[in-house]
């Protein structure tokens, strides 16, 4: 059933947004066999995915997900993974700083992709239970302002692509789609991606699916985070327009180090790093990169007038213990509601 779409892509044409949605619907209802799916993903990658194609895929994926009911504007700060840098869980740690700063966070994540420890791995070590019903996840979002949405539990139709993605062994459009198909429906977002040539494209997709304010980031040293060691390219979506600029960490007083400064390890080791940062015991590069990323995300979440103001707020949220308190609240409530 994917044949007509594969043939159009082979001819060098982009699918319309409607056609992309139709193709994804075929995939997510199990109507495409493995060879068709592999062909579709491969020829799409060779052509290069267009904005309308990614937006059409994303809208259909979101429509197939288990929607999370909640009453607040929400944000997600996450990356595509796949940057191969094996860092500790920077965005997961930053999520608690965001929540303390007044951003409502629905963090959509999975097990490790670019590291040995994905967000669900480290949260499990910290005592967070993430097997939540959509209703319980929404309750946690409204109650404490931060919840973790385990992607496979909310996007069950993705089971139809898991085997083929694994067998292909290279990045496909699903790597880009992962961070933008949040089942809570996002108002704000900070997305880290592995390819700096795609920041404007993904910002355009976020505009198309209804995100109001977003930063799409890719650092010069290859991280899907804002780096404290190198400039980071940013495409910002705000008020319906997209502008691209560079964040230079030195402008905010951060001293460059080496990639080894951010090295992660096992889930237990990464959980210990997160705890030390939130407890105020960790000073230096690991704390710095969390503060820089949380500061930018506080700006994207409209809780700070600028990235600089966001950085100052992020520092206060850690030093006051409020960020740690958000983690403690999440552990307590998921222990009660989770499985």
Locations of the language-model features?
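Short amphipathic alpha-helical face segments that pack within enzyme cores
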Residues: 39, 93-97, 289, 293-296
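Acidic, glycine/proline-rich low-complexity segments that act as flexible tails and inter-domain linkers
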Residues: 1-87, 101, 105, 256-260, ...
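Acidic, glycine-rich active-site loops and adjacent beta-strand->loop/helix elements
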Residues: 79-84, 109-115, 154, 220-221
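Gly/Ser/Thr-rich beta-alpha loop segments that engage phosphate groups in nucleotides
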Residues: 14, 83-84, 114, 120, ...
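Glycine-rich anion-binding loops and their surrounding alpha/beta cores
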Residues: 8, 63-66, 87, 102, ...
